């Protein structure tokens, strides 16, 4: 998405070269805008799996730049390993970056640990299957979407007889005549509608006459049937013998996911010449005068599969481009206002095509309502163009970010240019500008490791795209200036040669990719848990001291945030220097104060091997990072004070600057980032005005002089003339290295760092303070909701730290890497090159101006939008699962009672929980998030796996969870909630739903002479319940043992209900006893089975005997079933159902209370022809029946369900 913005610059000088550069930049941006706009003719699915061409171009450029660097440098690589980057690694790296930039790859979280030396996880990217279409994406449809499908059944002997509707001329003019005639032109027994979606984002098929073919598919997940057969070894899923509710739950989950995608379509697009059109594909049959009024404005429809007669009306158009389009293309065809009456109809009296547009109305009411819900929601997300321009500008460096004569340069400035079509299309441009999106990003980055991984990869891509601006010299060129002075070789000095060898031995070669990587890691320092690596500096010498100090200081300067958020690494760095060069003094310091203190203030006198990360570290403070006292007043005091000076110098960093990104509409939270230093406009530094970084580094040379004096007296026989000469040479020449590094740092590194730090995807701030480094970002479940629902084992029950897995690649620069960068970095126009004065160097301000202007604001904002939408989609999925697991989501829906009874009141099945989360793009497992991995097997088996929407916050040094003040209460889009209710009603509504659930089942063999879908067995008023007591009595007359059943009989009397217990052996005794009590004839009674799980075999034979004698019916008031409709002839009722339902009655013995059974209901009045029997018996029927609204006696009745609904309210 891009606004109509025009890039303008402030002309500070009349530099032709800069003007040309500006024009080229503008041309590039125009090309990018053209390439980023997708053609409407492109396949919608292709746009989901491919990046836009601008991002593809940037990845290609990135690939070319890195490949060039690999060829030029033998040490190029990614991460902390040496050697040339292998082709398979580079291919995977670029492919990973390209895939990670797609929002569909953001949602499934990746919990795998990164391999050593990697920042982008090359192994897990792209492995997880995700939704092929984002739940937030609008699809441009090529045909009118449908939810319902009108069809007919020809069943009886006379069902296919009748005249054929033939409309000769009409079938050639109207595209809908033939399909309607073919479907309904001959005789048919009944017409009905079924759910068979198209263009909805969900493939749902529900035929109330054939439930075995029920299917639902959303993205990569699909389900056939709504029940799972219990037969062992049966592979196919059938509707019969439904005894477990899990698959129904999965079906409901798929419906909810489908509701999140329903209605997200639009029918406007552009043609090949980039002219805006109302629809992509038009119907063109200009034959009939009546149809000519709407020809060209009805979208193509699938009349073959969805036979219907379309309707259309006109509404006023709000767009000027529409009026111009009509004026250009419709004036000469008889529909323009400028034509005469004899050339065509009077448009002024009919409808004015220049001011109105046709609106399709042949959407069924479900599709229309779902579409209206989405469109109404999107109306609230119209782009604020001015705010969008401000967002673009916030990604750019400002004049105040640069120190120097900034009048000689010009920076990139975005300004809004209002044009005619922009003013009109502003209503159509959407932007996730609601503050809720930003809140979702802040929360999702803590909940999902993959969101953090995506942010890391985005910033890595931005940083690595600038890798060509970083120049590193070969090691040989770096040390060449030390072996000669004023073109005179000094290599005969063995002490100097040894010093140079010490420097080379200290080095760990670094490449430009690692520098870009460390910039990103330093920005993301709050989420990095550094991994401490053991190292030793070896034998202490004065020359090694200065190289170590400079290397350590360079590392601390370049990555200040990583060290400040990982004090265990900073303490290790300082310890490594102090213990090597001041062993006695360091030992005395540790002996007197210990290594540090924990959070309770207890002294720590030992370091454990396992304390390599701050997560596993006991320390709250370190002795080597605290102020060191002045030391004992003895002969070693000077050494102690020198150690104190070294420690203070290492910990002092006056270069760090705070940069506040101000609060604007589309970046609603101001954040403050700590930057390594200040950007200086390149210029020749006067003798008395060195750069701040140079001043700071030169203190190490002064320390070297003092160290020689304190530890190696000039008259010390261990230090000969060559040693003193070598150190003097180093002291002089190292100033050239520090100046060259300082120029690179202030001219190149700092602006590169700032450009990455200005990315809008960065939502956090860098904080400092006592104990901040031990404040871990974390998430935790809502304890109150968990306790209210009496749950154990829920995910995030204990606080889960939101940080990257410890990895060397995420660590800050080390001392050895700093020693390498000190001598090898080089900036364009720098005074010194590898410690040698470069008299031919010339500063080209145009190159640095290009550096300041190279930020692609549109690309950064595009990545920001993807992350915002992916974050909300993630939290929306979590919230929907949370509300589904407690039943809140299905409140006021027909399915609520069943879902609450089957799932919410008992243990939530873990495999259903994982399937739900995976469907919504959330991949977790109980070992990582449920915090039950180390608990007992019994606890894991009893664990109730459901999500209650974790809250963001952080763990303080005492590991207490502190909730964040910003809480995303409800990330679910209103349209999703409305469409969930809509689709649940369409599927499960007792009146017009396709799947009608009924509570209450009756079993009877009483005959009837006709059956309809609303037929039911009448329940006699006398109710009999089995108490469970059975006595077996021996009958001496018959020499047999008979069973006596204790039954409780209940009937109504005026004003009261009478209950009586009887001891009977047969149904005759019940009837006779009740006749004696009531004083009247009693023909039948009803057995009542309240709990189907207590329906035992002892009662089965007794009840079945009474039913066969037509003395009783069996009533299961709490048993649930689904109505399965059959339209058959009455002569086939007993053949099809009697024996099967007698067997089904016996299967009730093994049902659970949450079971769903198949309730076959029959319609015999529609079928014509055949032999009519006098009566039939249909054993199992629901307690109450409702005539289904999806069946119509006449063709015109299809309009009852709203097929003429509007696409918007």
From Swiss-Prot:
<dbReference type="GO" id="GO:0016740">
    <property type="term" value="F:transferase activity"/>
</dbReference>
<comment type="function">
    <text>Inner capsid protein that self-assembles to form an icosahedral capsid with a T=2 symmetry, which consists of 120 copies of VP2, with channels at each of its five-fold vertices. This capsid constitutes the innermost concentric layer of the viral mature particle.</text>
</comment>
<comment type="subunit">
    <text>Homodecamer; each decamer is made up of two conformers of VP2, called VP2A and VP2B. 12 homodecamers assemble to form an icosahedral capsid.</text>
</comment>
<keyword id="KW-1153">Inner capsid protein</keyword>
<feature type="region of interest" description="Disordered">
    <location>
        <begin position="1"/>
        <end position="53"/>
    </location>
</feature>
<feature type="compositionally biased region" description="Basic and acidic residues">
    <location>
        <begin position="1"/>
        <end position="17"/>
    </location>
</feature>
<keyword id="KW-0175">Coiled coil</keyword>
<keyword id="KW-0167">Capsid protein</keyword>
<keyword id="KW-0946">Virion</keyword>
<keyword id="KW-1141">T=2 icosahedral capsid protein</keyword>
<comment type="similarity">
    <text>Belongs to the turreted BTV-fold inner capsid family.</text>
</comment>
<protein>
    <recommendedName>
        <fullName>Inner capsid protein VP2</fullName>
    </recommendedName>
</protein>
<feature type="compositionally biased region" description="Basic and acidic residues">
    <location>
        <begin position="26"/>
        <end position="53"/>
    </location>
</feature>
